[in-house]
């Protein structure tokens, strides 16, 4: 039987996160962190935001060793690991989705990524379901940066991103000839190849959403009980590490200031999500710079 107390003890295990469940941060901070990076950088600012759809907060124990063998086993921290590398240079934080307690929203994909990209929780008509599209009051960080002259890109697999959630913003970018581009892919490997192209190109802000943890969770279960879910998270960590390697291979890398963001839109329990329980609400956020420095 699931125990909330045990779940909190797991994610609070010393060594995994830089904060605790009691000091968790809202996913809405992501937009502010990215914009602050572009404002404050003394070199040419760049940012990649790698989304791991459906990756639970406690999945970080598969990648980062804790001081408690009952939590992370006797495994060492993954070597060729994006999460480990980003944590070492910045931090790995417990975060939460699904709105505040007095104004909850669905812990699902549309609400999750939109809240992260817009920097605020969804308005009442958008708190549930998918039949809505962001309006002028909810510009994403991509739109804000492209209007400032930066080139931005959004790469994803789920059709609803393009048909509903970001449709208004896609139309706005096309009408106003903004350097804001959207790419619809079919698989995680296609998405990886697309992100490599973006990294090797001239984009300033790159956002992409991998789907495997969420798909495995819906098919056979979120969490430790489904080895396919575990392997989905671990495989994404390796793919993300390869993306970081591609960034360092850029001929202009030394003249650039890259912020790496890795995060999730929601967790999951059984074969679903969307509720306000801790497994659905609690997520992770990895930043290549300490959050305190970014928010000064």
Place the predicted regions along the sequence by residue.
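Feature captures the catalytic ectodomains and active-site-proximal regions of enzymes
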Residues: 2-296
């Amino acid at each position: 039987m699931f125990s909330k107390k045990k779940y909190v003890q797991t994610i609070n295990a010393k060594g995994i996160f830089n904060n605790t469940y009691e000091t968790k941060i809202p996913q809405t901070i992501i937009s502010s962190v990215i914009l602050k990076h572009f404002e404050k950088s003394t070199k040419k600012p760049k940012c990649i935001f790698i989304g791991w759809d459906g990756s639970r907060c406690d999945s970080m124990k598969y990648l980062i060793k804790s001081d408690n063998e009952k939590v992370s086993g006797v495994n060492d921290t993954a070597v060729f690991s994006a999460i480990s590398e980003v944590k070492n240079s910045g931090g790995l934080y417990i975060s939460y989705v699904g709105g505040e307690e007095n104004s909850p929203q669905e812990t699902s994909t549309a609400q999750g990524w939109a809240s992260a990209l817009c920097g605020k929780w969804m308005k009442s008509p958008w708190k549930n379901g998918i039949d809505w599209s962001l309006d002028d009051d909810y510009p994403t960080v991509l739109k804000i940066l492209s209007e400032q002259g930066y080139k931005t890109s959004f790469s994803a697999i789920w059709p609803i991103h393009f048909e509903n959630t970001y449709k208004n913003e896609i139309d706005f970018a096309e009408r106003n000839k903004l350097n804001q581009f959207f790419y619809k892919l079919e698989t995680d490997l296609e998405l990886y190849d697309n992100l490599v192209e973006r990294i090797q190109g001239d984009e300033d802000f790159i956002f992409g959403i991998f789907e495997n943890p969420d798909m495995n969770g819906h098919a056979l279960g979120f969490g430790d009980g489904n080895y396919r879910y575990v392997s989905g998270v671990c495989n994404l960590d390796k793919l993300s590490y390869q993306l970081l390697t591609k960034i360092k291979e850029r001929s202009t890398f030394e003249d650039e200031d890259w912020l790496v963001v890795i995060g999730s839109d929601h967790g999951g329990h059984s074969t679903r999500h969307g509720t306000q329980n801790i497994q659905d609400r609690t997520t992770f956020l990895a930043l290549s710079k300490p959050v305190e420095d970014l928010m000064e």
